[in-house]
C-alpha cells in the first residue's frame, strides 16, 4: 500500500456527512489509526475553527492537526498547509464540518478548491436502503467528486447487506459497526483526549473495527498540489520578545498555526500552567491566556494565588496580555459556574462572568484594525457583565452585525473572539507589542 508519489502529491480525501452527529470524527480517527498501522504516513486536517475534534484526531494520528477554512485561514494558506503535508506523507484526511454543503464556505467548497474527492460518512443506525437515496441526493446537489461512502453504526451483517443493496454507483469505502464506547461530549463539543479513560485503547478498538475496501481505496487517485511550501514572509515584529502562554487542561484552545505565526514574527514562546499555580515566566515580555474549559476548574484556578498574583503584577507593569475567551473568563473579578457558585478570579477587568444554559456566542467574525482585518470566530456559553466600555467590536461574517466586544485596560486585551493570527500578523504582533509603529 505504500505510495511512491511525486512531490506535493498524496492520496487526499475530505470526510464529510449529511449533518453533525454522523460520526465524522470517530470515523476519521479510526481510519487514520488503521492506515498508520498499515505503514502509511498520515496527516489529518479539520475544516472550520473547532479546537476539540483536532485534539482527538491528533491523538489518533500522532501529528499536529491544522484548521482549514477558505475564509478564516484563506485559500493560499490552506493550499500551503496541504502542499506541505502532501510533500511529507502518503495520505491526508480532511474532516469536514457539519453537513457537506453547509456553511459559506462549505466543506464542499474546500474540496472543489483543491480537487479533493469527498467521502461521506452516513450513520445507518436508523436506516437501511434509504441510505442510497441520501447518497444520490448528495451526488445530484453537487458538483463534488463523490469517491465513496463510509457507513457507520451498522448493527449486524444483515443490516450491512440491506444498506449495501441501497447504495448504487458509489463505492462503499469502509464500514464501522455500532460502537459500545463512543467518544464523549460536553457543551463545547467532544471532551479533550486526556479526559477519556484509556483513550488510546478506545482509538485502537475503532481501528480494529473499521473495515476498509482496499480496492475502492486504491481507486482514489492522488491529488497533486501546486504552490510554495513556505509561508509568506513575515516581518520580525516580535524579534527579541518572549511570550508566555498558558497551556493546560483549562487553557488548551490554541491553533498550531497561531504558535507558528508568533514564532515566524520572531517571538520566543514559553508555556506555563495556571492549574499548577505556576507563575508567569520571569523572562516574559507578554502573556497569552487562550480559551479552554476554565469553568470546569474554578476551584483550582480560584485558589491558584501564585499564578493570580503574577498576573496582577504583570498588569500593573503594563505588560501586554491577551485574554481570549476562557482567558477573559478568569481575569474578571469572579466566575459563576454552571451550578451557580461564584468563584473569585484574577480581577484585571471589573465584572462577573456567568455560565449560561445555552449558547451565548457563535460564528465566524472579524476585527478591523489599523493593520488590516483580523479574522477568527466565537463559540461560548458564558457572558461577561462589566462597566468597562469596549474599545471595539467584531463583525459577524454571516450578517455584518456586531459580534464580540473587545476590551482594553492598559496593555490588556480581553475578548471572547478567538483570533486566527496569520490572517493579519501585523495586528497580532501589535497586541503583544503595542509600541510597534504603524
Swiss-Prot record:
The record marks 418 as: Increases nucleophilicity of active site Cys. Coiled coil: none annotated. It catalyses: cob(II)yrinate + 2 L-glutamine + 2 ATP + 2 H2O = cob(II)yrinate a,c diamide + 2 L-glutamate + 2 ADP + 2 phosphate + 2 H(+). The keyword Heme does not apply. Keywords: ATP-binding, Cobalamin biosynthesis, Glutamine amidotransferase, Ligase, Magnesium, Nucleotide-binding. Its EC number is 6.3.5.11. It is an enzyme of class 6 (ligase). GO terms for biological process: cobalamin biosynthetic process. Pfam families: CbiA, GATase_3. The keyword Transport does not apply. Residues 242-426 form the GATase cobBQ-type domain. The active site is at 325 (nucleophile). GO terms for molecular function: ATP binding; cobyrinic acid a,c-diamide synthase activity. Pathway: Cofactor biosynthesis; adenosylcobalamin biosynthesis; cob(II)yrinate a,c-diamide from sirohydrochlorin (anaerobic route): step 10/10. Its cofactor is Mg(2+). Comprises of two domains. The C-terminal domain contains the binding site for glutamine and catalyzes the hydrolysis of this substrate to glutamate and ammonia. The N-terminal domain is anticipated to bind ATP and cobyrinate and catalyzes the ultimate synthesis of the diamide product. The ammonia produced via the glutaminase domain is probably translocated to the adjacent domain via a molecular tunnel, where it reacts with an activated intermediate. The a and c carboxylates of cobyrinate are activated for nucleophilic attack via formation of a phosphorylated intermediate by ATP. CbiA catalyzes first the amidation of the c-carboxylate, and then that of the a-carboxylate. Catalyzes the ATP-dependent amidation of the two carboxylate groups at positions a and c of cobyrinate, using either L-glutamine or ammonia as the nitrogen source. Belongs to the CobB/CbiA family. This is Cobyrinate a,c-diamide synthase. The gene is cbiA.
Amino acid at each position: 500500500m505504500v505510495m511512491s508519489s511525486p512531490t506535493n502529491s498524496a492520496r487526499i480525501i475530505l470526510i464529510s456527512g449529511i449533518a453533525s452527529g454522523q460520526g465524522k470524527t470517530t470515523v476519521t480517527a479510526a481510519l487514520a489509526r488503521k492506515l498508520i498501522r498499515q505503514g502509511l504516513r498520515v496527516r489529518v486536517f479539520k475544516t472550520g475553527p473547532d479546537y476539540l475534534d483536532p485534539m482527538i484526531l491528533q491523538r489518533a494520528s500522532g501529528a499536529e492537526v491544522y484548521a482549514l477554512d477558505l475564509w478564516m485561514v484563506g485559500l493560499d494558506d490552506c493550499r500551503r498547509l496541504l502542499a506541505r503535508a502532501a510533500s511529507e506523507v502518503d495520505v491526508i484526511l480532511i474532516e469536514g464540518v457539519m453537513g457537506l454543503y453547509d456553511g459559506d464556505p462549505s466543506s464542499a467548497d474546500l474540496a472543489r478548491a483543491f480537487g479533493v474527492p469527498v467521502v461521506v460518512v452516513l450513520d445507518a443506525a436508523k436506516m437501511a436502503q434509504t441510505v442510497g437515496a441520501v447518497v444520490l441526493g448528495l451526488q445530484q446537489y453537487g458538483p463534488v467528486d463523490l469517491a465513496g461512502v463510509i457507513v457507520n453504526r451498522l448493527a449486524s451483517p444483515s443490516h450491512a447487506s440491506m444498506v449495501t443493496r441501497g447504495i448504487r454507483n458509489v463505492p462503499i469505502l469502509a464500514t464501522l459497526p455500532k460502537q459500545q464506547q463512543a467518544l464523549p461530549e460536553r457543551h463545547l463539543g467532544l471532551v479533550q483526549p486526556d479526559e477519556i479513560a484509556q483513550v488510546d485503547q478506545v482509538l485502537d478498538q475503532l481501528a480494529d473495527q473499521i473495515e476498509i475496501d482496499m480496492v475502492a481505496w486504491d481507486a482514489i487517485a492522488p491529488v497533486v498540489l501546486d504552490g510554495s511550501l513556505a509561508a509568506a514572509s513575515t516581518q520580525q515584529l516580535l524579534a527579541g520578545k518572549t511570550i508566555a502562554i498558558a497551556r493546560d487542561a483549562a487553557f488548551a484552545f490554541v491553533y498550531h498555526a497561531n504558535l507558528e505565526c508568533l514564532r515566524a514574527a520572531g517571538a520566543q514562546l514559553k508555556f506555563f500552567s495556571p492549574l499548577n499555580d505556576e507563575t508567569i515566566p520571569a523572562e516574559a515580555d507578554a502573556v497569552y491566556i487562550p480559551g479552554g474549559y476554565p469553568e470546569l476548574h474554578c476551584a483550582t484556578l480560584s485558589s491558584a494565588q501564585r499564578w493570580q498574583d503574577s498576573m496582577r503584577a504583570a498588569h500593573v507593569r503594563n505588560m501586554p496580555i491577551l485574554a481570549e475567551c476562557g482567558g477573559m473568563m478568569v481575569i474578571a473579578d469572579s466566575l459563576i459556574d454552571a451550578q451557580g457558585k461564584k468563584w473569585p478570579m484574577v480581577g484585571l477587568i471589573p465584572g462577573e462572568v456567568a455560565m449560561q444554559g445555552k449558547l451565548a456566542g457563535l460564528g465566524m467574525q472579524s476585527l478591523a484594525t489599523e493593520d488590516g482585518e483580523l479574522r477568527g470566530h466565537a463559540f461560548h456559553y458564558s457572558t461577561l457583565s462589566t462597566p468597562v466600555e469596549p474599545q471595539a467590536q467584531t463583525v459577524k461574517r454571516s450578517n455584518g452585525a456586531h459580534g464580540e466586544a473587545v476590551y482594553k485596560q492598559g496593555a490588556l486585551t480581553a475578548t471572547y473572539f478567538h483570533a486566527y493570527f496569520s490572517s493579519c500578523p501585523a495586528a497580532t504582533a501589535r497586541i503583544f507589542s503595542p509600541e510597534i509603529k504603524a
